[in-house]
């Protein structure tokens, strides 16, 4: 699976979906995250929890054995597609810059996406978990 910022934030903040997301990650042998997503999470966590948050994030990524994937040309093309078709101000999904990294890695790798919220449900990406 590919893991979006929203899922990691939910886990680190112990939100109601945290256990479902943690179990989904643990049960999947493929755990991917775009370097762009990792940067987005780092920016959010640093703003909220300073260096302690960064350490918590890095420890979680290590313990969960999440593989960080470099952003390549194929992902660039898919991210452009994502924004053109589902981007904020263009489509109800309103994907932002960071969302485009997760979308593109999910589509180019053929892996489902783990996310929280309703943005990706309005796209053609496959969800790793359905939260009601």
Regions found by a protein language model. Give the residues of each.
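Short loop->beta-strand "edge-of-pocket" segments that line small-molecule binding or catalytic clefts
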Residues: 30-32, 64-69
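Acidic, PIN/NYN-like endoribonuclease modules and their adjacent C-terminal/linker elements
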Residues: 103, 107-132
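Histidine- and aromatic-rich ligand-binding microenvironments
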Residues: 4, 33-34, 95-96, 117, ...
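Active-site neighborhoods of divalent-metal-dependent phosphate/nucleic-acid chemistry enzymes
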Residues: 68-112
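A generic structural signal for short hydrophobic patches within well-formed alpha-helices
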Residues: 8-9, 38, 120-121
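Short, well-structured N-terminal submotif of metal-dependent ribonuclease cores
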Residues: 1-33, 46-59
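A general structural signal for well-ordered alpha-helical segments in protein cores
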Residues: 18, 38, 54, 76-79
